Amino acid sequence: MKKKLLSLLLALSMVAALAACSAGGAGTPTPTPAAEPTPAVEPTPAPETAPAAPALSGTLKVVATNETYMTLFEKFAAETGVKVELLSMSSGDVLSKLRAEGGTPSADLWFGGGIDAFMSAKDDGLLEQVSFAASSDLADAFKDADGYWFSKGLTIVGFLVNNTLMGELNITAPATWTDLLNSEYKGEIVMSNPAVSGTNYAVVNAMLQKLGGEAGWDYFNSLNENIAFYGKRGSDPKNKVIADEYAVGITYIDGTIEDLLDEYDVSIVYPTDGIPWMPDGVAAFKNADNVEAAKYFIEWLFSSDENLRLLAEIDQKTSVKLIKPNLEGIELDYDTAILLDEDLSLFGAQRTAVLEQFEALMGDKAVND
C-alpha cells in the first residue's frame, strides 16, 4: 500500500542559509535564521535520459550505505558496459577509511550517507570535482558550490517504538525529544554512534542548534542516562526494536521502516518538538582508479528523470524532488511543518569537535564490534 511519510521538508527556504552561513564555536553550533524564499520560477523540463556515455571501461568500485542500490548500478552497467562492485559501509566508516588510505582510495564512488562526512572529505581534499550540464537543474542548497558533492535525497529521523515492550513495561510511547529524558525509559533506548551514522550525527548537531550549545550538551548528557548502548551501524536501533530487545530506537524513517509496521508490533513516532534531517551525499573519490566512470555515473544519475525515479523507488522516499525540482513523475508527499531549522554548514565545519565531545559523553556505551 501507499505509505505516507510526514512531510517534514520545508522546500528550499529552510536550507537556503547553507552556502552563506559560517561555522560557530567548536562543538557548539549556533543556528542561523533561514533566508526568505525566492519567488518561484517556472522549471525547465528535465530530460528523460542521460547523455551518451563516454568511452568507459573497467570496474566501478562503489561504497554505499546498503546493497539495495544494486538495481540502479546494474542499469548503469547495462548501459555503459562498466562492471560494478559494491561494498556496504556507513558514512563515518567511509571517511575514516579514506583518511587511512592517504590519498589512494580503494573505491571510485561514494554513494549515500550523511552529508557531514562529504563536507569533511571535501575539506580534506579527498573528493574529485565533477561538472555536468544538468547540475544547473539541481537546487543550490543540495549541491556543493564547487561540484565536489551532490545530494540524492534527504533522510529524516524519528523513533521506532516496540508496542509489546511498552505494554510489558507499563510505559507510554515518547512523543517528543524531551520525553526521552523520562526515567521510565532508562536502559530502553538505542541510538547509533554519531561518529559512524550520519543519521544520528544529524540528531546531535540539529539538537545542539535547536537548544544552543550548553543546553544542548546538557540534553545529551541526560539522554545518555537512558541509552542502553550506541550501535556501530545505522540499522542497529530498528533491528534491536523489532527483535523485542529494546523499547525505543532513534532511527531514520523511510518506506523500509514503514514496512515494518505490517510485520512487527511496532509504531513510528515523529517527535512533535522537531524532526532532524540530513541530506544524503554522492561524490567521486580523488585519485580513484576509475574516476572517469565515477564522474559519469553522477552525471548519468542526475541528468535522467528515469534514473532518479528508480532511485526514489529504491529509497522509498520522494525527497529527490527537492534536489531536482523539475523532476517529472514524482511529487512530494511531505508535511513540512515540524522539520528542524538546520544550518548545514555547521554539520561539516564542526563535525570533529562535536564528535570528540560526544565520544567522551558515550563512555563505554559505544559498541565497537
Q: For each predicted feature, which ranges?
A:
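Bacterial lipoprotein signal-peptidase II cleavage site
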Residues: 19-36
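Periplasmic-binding protein-like
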Residues: 140, 155, 219-223, 230-231, ...
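Short beta-strand->loop
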Residues: 127-136, 149-150, 178, 264-276, ...
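Conserved C-terminal helix/tail region of periplasmic/extracytoplasmic solute-binding proteins
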Residues: 340-369
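Extracytoplasmic ligand-binding site segments that recognize negatively charged/polar headgroups
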Residues: 63-70, 92-93, 105-245
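Mature extracytoplasmic/periplasmic domains
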Residues: 280, 285-342
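A ligand-binding cleft/hinge motif common to bilobed small-molecule-binding domains
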Residues: 116-120, 242, 247-265, 315
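Short, polar/charged alpha-helical segment
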Residues: 47-52, 63-85, 99, 159, ...
